[in-house]
Every structure is written in C-alpha cells, then in structure tokens.
Amino acid sequence: MSITKEFDTIAAISTPLGEGAIGIVRISGTDALKIASKIYRGKDLSAIQSHTLNYGHIVDPDKNEILDEVMLGVMLAPKTFTREDVIEINTHGGIAVTNEILQLILRHGARMAEPGEFTKRAFLNGRVDLTQAEAVMDLIRAKTDKAMDIAVKQLDGSLKTLINNTRQEILNTLAQVEVNIDYPEYDDVEEMTTTLMREKTQEFQALMENLLRTARRGKILREGLSTAIIGRPNVGKSSLLNNLLREEKAIVTDIEGTTRDVIEEYVNIKGVPLKLVDTAGIRDTDDIVEKIGVERSKKALEEADLVLLVLNSSEPLTLQDRSLLELSKESNRIVLLNKTDLPQKIEVNELPKNVIPISVLENENIDKIEERINDIFFDNAGMVEHDATYLSNARHISLIEKAVDSLKAVNEGLELGMPVDLLQVDMTRTWEILGEITGDAAPDELITQLFSQFCLGK
C-alpha cells in the first residue's frame, strides 16, 4: 500500500462477514456521492443534509432489480473519519447481500479498499496521527474494559498531545541554544547555554522515564498475561481452568494424561486479560501423543508471564511436585494447594511462602488468585489511573527507550564538558525519534506495514 495521497474512491464491507442483523458497506472518496446516487433509490442524495440516515433501496440499474432495503448514511467532507465524502450503506446482515452491494459499487467506479485504507486516509488527511490510528486497532482488539479505556484515551489524543508538546519544547530549547551560540551578548553565555541544556535535558528525560514506567502495566492490559497452569497429572488443572472460565473447556476425568495438548483460553480477571494455558501434566511417559503435550507444556512454562502451579494438598509431595517447584521457582509464580475439601497430607513446611489453599470443587478461595495477580503485577495500586497516559504498544515503548538513550547521551556529554553545539545532534535525534511515534517523522515502509495489519473495511 503506497503512502502517497490518492484521491480515487474506495469501498469495502466494514462489518464482520457472516449472518447478522446489520451489515455496513462503506464508500469514501470524491466520487462516493456520485456512485451511491447511481444505485440508490430514495431521496436525491445531492440535496440531502450531511450526517443523516436516509431510508431507501439499493437497486442494480442494469437489471432494474432491488437488492435490499437499506438505511443510507451521508457524511460530507471534511467532518468525516477520512475527511473525504463518506457513504455508509446499512443493509440486512449476511454474506450474500453485503457482497452483492459491494460488487455493484465496484462496478460503478469505486476501488476495493486495502486493509486499513480508510484509517490510512484519515492519517494522510490529518484526521489522526499514528498513535490514534494504532489506537483504533487496539480498541477493536481490546479484550477487557481496562484495555478499552487505554485505547480510548489514546484515540482521544492523550499520547499524541504529550509527544507533540515535548517535541515543541525540544525545538524551543534548540532554538534558544542556537541563538545563544550565534549571538552571544554576555560574557557567560557559554555557561548559560550549558545550564539551559542540562535543565531541559533532565526535564525531558524524567518525562520520558515516567512514561516508560507505565509500559509494563499498559502492555499487560493491552496484550494480556500468558498464564501457564502447571502441575502433575490429575491435580485439578483442567478443573481450575474451567472454574476460571465459568464453562467446560477442558475434559475433566480421574485418568492421568487426559489433557494431552495445551489448551488456550482468554479470561478477564479484574480487567486483566489472562491467556490461560492448561498444560498437559508434566511427567515421564511412553505415550507419543502425551509426550508431545508434555514438551509443549515445558515450552509454555518457559514463555509464560505468570505460572499457576497446582498441587494436591490431600497427598504428600511427590518427586514430580518437587521438580515442578524447582522448575518454576524463577517465574512469577502462584502456588495453589488444591483439594482443601479433603484431609490435608501435603508437607506445608516444605512449600514456598504465600501459597493459596483452594478447592476448585467447592469454588473456595478462587478470588484470592485474582488478588495475588494484582499484587504481583500491579503492586496493589489498581489497574488504570483515570487521568494517566499509558504506553502499551511495543513500537512506542521501543522508541521512548531510544529517546531516553539520546537524552542520556546529551547529559553525559555535558558532564564531560563537550561543546553544546555538538550535543545538539543528540537532542535533535530525540526530536526525530518522538516524531516516529506520531508519524511526523516515520519512514514510509513503517507506515505501510502498520496499516497493512488493519482489518479490511477499517
């Protein structure tokens, strides 16, 4: 997808394909109204007020055949998402009707939109910056209300405003330094310039580092925690998974080795999306299929952000239990003593501190797991502060880290007594890096790659 401005008219189905109450076919571009007028039977579209919904029919003019009864939305530039004329045809949901209407639109002069092209046009026409464009996709993919809150704030421009204000402050600083260097009016101009550069650099660095402190929380809320449920066979792992999901997803039996693969499901734990991985019981086995499951379990353990180790409190610790305790000791781990509804036989004094006794069968202490997750990953400080700006995107985090490195280079140069005019290079580099976040200084290849990840019709 080229990032150069194109002014042809594009169209796509904007709702998920499949059966549903409503389907939406979107048209955007200079000929949107003209194309819609050819296939719409109802009020004269050229006389219709912008931002209104209008009842009518979509008709194939070549056959004089009605395709569907619709509500047609007219939105005229520049007050639209793309800042172009936009038509949205609200049809009855279904693959056949929406596709038939789309093909009719394409035959009358529109081009099939590429993935993310509507949002790309919003970016190219100055309606949104890159952070806001990425927030659109984050909002679509949000799995919890907390992730949605972060995406909405970013879409509203919170990160854009912070970055743009910082870039402007950097420009102001560079301009002042340049004036001091080119037009020295005081004997101590060099000292004044060095002091200004040091103060501003430290200010910018502190701002960027504060932003980075939100990254861990923001990334978790955006992408979720990969959570491995581990334990020897038949200790209640699958029952725990089903309990957390509030539905039967894993087979639960008394037969060892029932879970032969890795089962993955998302669950919302107090606003945090957990990707729960129910692993096959880790044990020595000659069963080839089960052995593959065990190897996948070990891999899931290595890659997990959080480990839930399930032990059977009604039995003494086994060699397998001890092996799993050792294997997971460096992980963010919560040890769960299941089957507390039975007489306890496990050696509690040999276990790590802060284990949680639970009974999956009787749904006892499951809420304690949620509280412990909050303690481990959020320092019990709550999930999202209402007015805070969060970093949650890996691209943004990487660029902010690079900006901090550039600012550190300026500070180190000042400590070594390097001339301020040489240090302007690193300060300018910081300004450029921050511009990559908003798209003001992003390479064409990056922009093309970002929008290609969007769904068709968005």
Curated annotation (Swiss-Prot):
Q: Where in the cell is it found?
A: Cytoplasm
Organism domain of life: Bacteria
InterPro entries given in the database record? G_TrmE, GTP-bd, GTP-bd_TrmE_N, GTPase_MnmE, MnmE_dom2, MnmE_helical, P-loop_NTPase, Small_GTP-bd
Known Gene3D superfamilies for this protein? P-loop containing nucleotide triphosphate hydrolases (3.40.50.300), Probable tRNA modification gtpase trme, domain 1 (3.30.1360.120), tRNA modification GTPase MnmE domain 2 (1.20.120.430)
User: What processes in GO biological process is this protein linked to?
Assistant: tRNA methylation; tRNA wobble uridine modification
Which Pfam families does the entry link to?
Answer: MMR_HSR1, MnmE_helical, TrmE_N
Looking at the UniProt record for this protein, which Gene Ontology cellular component terms does it annotate, in alphabetical order? cytosol
List of residues binding GTP: 234-239, 253-259, 278-281
Cofactor(s) this protein cannot do without? K(+)
Q: What is its EC number?
A: 3.6.-.-
Q: How is the cofactor bound?
A: Binds 1 potassium ion per subunit.
Q: What class of enzyme is it?
A: hydrolase
Keywords from the UniProt entry:
Cytoplasm, GTP-binding, Hydrolase, Magnesium, Metal-binding, Nucleotide-binding, Potassium, tRNA processing
Which positions does UniProt annotate for (6S)-5-formyl-5,6,7,8-tetrahydrofolate binding?
Answer: 26, 88, 127, 458
- What PROSITE patterns does this protein's entry cite? G_TRME
Q: Which residues bind Mg(2+)?
A: 238, 259
Q: Which residues form the TrmE-type G domain?
A: 224-378
Gene Ontology molecular function: GTP binding; GTPase activity; metal ion binding
Q: Identify its protein family.
A: Belongs to the TRAFAC class TrmE-Era-EngA-EngB-Septin-like GTPase superfamily. TrmE GTPase family.
Quaternary structure note:
Homodimer. Heterotetramer of two MnmE and two MnmG subunits.
Q: What PANTHER family does its record include?
A: TRNA MODIFICATION GTPASE GTPBP3, TRNA MODIFICATION GTPASE GTPBP3, MITOCHONDRIAL
Q: Relate the protein's function as given in its record.
A: Exhibits a very high intrinsic GTPase hydrolysis rate. Involved in the addition of a carboxymethylaminomethyl (cmnm) group at the wobble position (U34) of certain tRNAs, forming tRNA-cmnm(5)s(2)U34.
Could you identify this protein by its name? tRNA modification GTPase MnmE
